[in-house]
Regions:
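Sequence context surrounding c-type heme c attachment/ligation sites in exported
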Residues: 19-178, 197-198, 232, 238
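A conserved position within tetratricopeptide repeats
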Residues: 153, 157-160, 193, 227, ...
Length: 247
């Protein structure tokens, strides 16, 4: 609740207007930018509650203040932080998207609306997990990437913020290898093996990564392992034919 209330100025530029010092919440809005000025304060608080939950953030993410600071001391009016300015633009973007959705020909789900949660899902940076892991692996190495992965898995597993299914580390490993970090890519696949033992597809990825460093023998062994785990794996069969190591 506190997290949501303290973000109440995100889009409105709210100021304490004709109020006693320290009064919170105020009785009215002024200096609004996106939310209509006539919107009841209680309704704005509810909107901000949703925004806060959707991004998993607190007051000081957008407003000038510190964690745990009393709300009457947070400077909600000043537009100092980039995150607050971005938030306003994102609200305008969401509004425009929903207006365009309503104009789609043949649309049947008339009640469907895009919200912050549609992309953010409880995180302030809405990117796929494989992108985050790839970025970290290519810039800081597999050890750092795996620390990030494990921390996120511990915090978010079972929620819809990130996809911890088998493809995530497979894709991250492949993209890391394409960036010239084959050894790091193989470490990502080793980690994935812990969560998905017996996977056939993972060994196809391993074989493809090994081919990137021209290790045909090791790649063939990986493709054979994929077939051992799933004799119908067509991609593994095709790769073996391509490298001249048919089953």
């Amino acid at each position: 609740m506190r997290r949501a209330i303290c973000l109440v100025l995100l889009a409105s530029g709210l100021r304490l207007h004709a109020q006693a010092p320290g009064k919170w919440p105020p009785d009215s809005l002024i200096n609004t930018r996106v939310i209509p000025r006539s919107t009841p304060v209680s309704q704005v608080v509810g909107m901000m509650r949703n925004f806060a939950a959707d991004l998993g953030v607190r007051c000081h993410y957008c407003h000038v203040g510190e964690e745990g600071m009393p709300l009457d001391r947070v400077d909600f009016a000043v537009d100092e932080k980039r995150t607050k300015l971005v938030a306003r633009e994102m609200m305008r973007m969401v509004r425009d998207i929903n207006q365009r959705l309503d104009s789609l020909p043949g649309r049947v789900a008339a009640g469907l609306q895009v919200t912050c949660a549609t992309c953010h899902r409880g995180t302030n940076r809405p990117v796929p997990l494989f992108t985050m892991i790839t970025e970290t692996a290519t810039s800081q190495g597999a050890d750092s990437a795996l620390r990030v992965y494990r921390a996120l898995r511990q915090r978010f597993y079972g929620r819809d913020s990130y996809d911890f299914g088998e493809p995530t580390l497979n894709i991250a490993a492949f993209r890391t290898a394409r960036a010239g970090k084959v050894a790091d890519a193989l470490l990502l696949l080793d980690e994935n093996e812990k969560y998905f033992p017996g996977s056939s597809g993972m060994y196809v990825f391993r074989g493809n990564v090994l081919l990137m460093r021209a290790d045909t023998t090791a790649a063939a062994a990986a493709f054979h392992e994929a077939l051992k785990r799933d004799s119908t794996n067509a991609e593994a069969l095709g790769r073996l034919r391509t490298i001249g190591r048919p089953r």
